[in-house]
Amino acid sequence: MEQLLRAQLHTTTLRAFGSSGGGCISEGYAYYTDSGPVFVKVNRRTQARQMFEGEMASLEALRNTGLVRVPKPMKVIDLPGGGAVFVMEHLKMKSLSSQASKLGEQMADLHLYNQKLREKSKTRQNTVGCGAEGAEPQGVTKFGFHTVTCCGFIPQVNEWQEDWPTFFTRHRLQAQLDLIEKDYADRETQELWSRLQVKIPDLFAGIEIVPALLHGDLWSGNVAEDDQGPVIYDPASFYGHSEFELAIASMFGGFPRSFFTAYHRKIPKAPGFDKRLLLYQLFNYLNHWNHFGREYRSPSLGVMRKLLR
């Protein structure tokens, strides 16, 4: 692999440093190169290129806002024996602590970014002498993303939809439940789902949802800080409801209260927030069930029952 990296990165220097690491899905290695330190993720699954290309597109979208700090993505490279590697900027990070409040503010700004773009675009169109065309981005009007992304190793369809409940039900919940049906044929899950899915539109009654660019997998293992401030990484981005982002952040710990306080100063909770948060947590429990097995069956069904009360 090192010979491949030297050739693809056009570097004479390739010296490993630090300890190898990674998460549940991929291995991780750090190297010094002629152009500076890089972090290399390695995955030998057949769909590794698709997974890494989705992550690269997500990092680029987040980075282009100028509102949050992410590692600069560099290159996805196929491995000769199957799988792929993803090369990105190496950042010397530590666990999120003193920068939690700042990250809350930055995530709120990120979630408001597309709305502000759309408002600017409308203003330009309504101004005499200003056409709709121009170099400035116009803002996104639908829910989805321009490419497949993976939350963990599961590919997510991001086909554009006009309304959020349709997108979320079809491309997030139903997609996860189809995998559970295939692998477990769990009758109780299907019975609860048949009752729940007809109630989902009611949870969104009376609220306006503007597509927001999301990180898509904002748990504590995907956030950190360094000397310059907060850092987020390992995204599975798409344009969705801003509240979706907070579900996994509130599930497994690691985010101080200051994060949520700072966030909600900029984006207050809308009516029905708590019940929708449960709905978004359901997606994450189902995704964990599909990744890690039946230990996540009980919390998945528990959330479904709560939503049916």
Curated annotation (Swiss-Prot):
<dbReference type="GO" id="GO:0005524">
    <property type="term" value="F:ATP binding"/>
</dbReference>
<keyword id="KW-0007">Acetylation</keyword>
<comment type="similarity">
    <text>Belongs to the fructosamine kinase family.</text>
</comment>
<keyword id="KW-0808">Transferase</keyword>
<feature type="modified residue" description="N-acetylmethionine">
    <location>
        <position position="1"/>
    </location>
</feature>
<dbReference type="GO" id="GO:0005739">
    <property type="term" value="C:mitochondrion"/>
</dbReference>
<comment type="subunit">
    <text>Monomer.</text>
</comment>
<dbReference type="InterPro" id="IPR011009">
    <property type="entry name" value="Kinase-like_dom_sf"/>
</dbReference>
<comment type="function">
    <text>Fructosamine-3-kinase involved in protein deglycation by mediating phosphorylation of fructoselysine residues on glycated proteins, to generate fructoselysine-3 phosphate. Fructoselysine-3 phosphate adducts are unstable and decompose under physiological conditions. Involved in intracellular deglycation in erythrocytes and pancreatic islets. Involved in the response to oxidative stress by mediating deglycation of NFE2L2/NRF2, glycation impairing NFE2L2/NRF2 function. Also able to phosphorylate psicosamines and ribulosamines.</text>
</comment>
<dbReference type="GO" id="GO:0030389">
    <property type="term" value="P:fructosamine metabolic process"/>
</dbReference>
<dbReference type="Pfam" id="PF03881">
    <property type="entry name" value="Fructosamin_kin"/>
</dbReference>
<keyword id="KW-0547">Nucleotide-binding</keyword>
<dbReference type="GO" id="GO:0102194">
    <property type="term" value="F:protein-fructosamine 3-kinase activity"/>
</dbReference>
<dbReference type="GO" id="GO:0005829">
    <property type="term" value="C:cytosol"/>
</dbReference>
<protein>
    <recommendedName>
        <fullName>Fructosamine-3-kinase</fullName>
        <ecNumber>2.7.1.171</ecNumber>
        <ecNumber>2.7.1.172</ecNumber>
    </recommendedName>
</protein>
<feature type="binding site">
    <location>
        <begin position="89"/>
        <end position="91"/>
    </location>
    <ligand>
        <name>ATP</name>
    </ligand>
</feature>
<dbReference type="GO" id="GO:0030855">
    <property type="term" value="P:epithelial cell differentiation"/>
</dbReference>
<dbReference type="InterPro" id="IPR016477">
    <property type="entry name" value="Fructo-/Ketosamine-3-kinase"/>
</dbReference>
<dbReference type="GO" id="GO:0036525">
    <property type="term" value="P:protein deglycation"/>
</dbReference>
<keyword id="KW-0418">Kinase</keyword>
<feature type="active site" description="Proton acceptor">
    <location>
        <position position="217"/>
    </location>
</feature>
<dbReference type="GO" id="GO:0102193">
    <property type="term" value="F:protein-ribulosamine 3-kinase activity"/>
</dbReference>
<keyword id="KW-0067">ATP-binding</keyword>
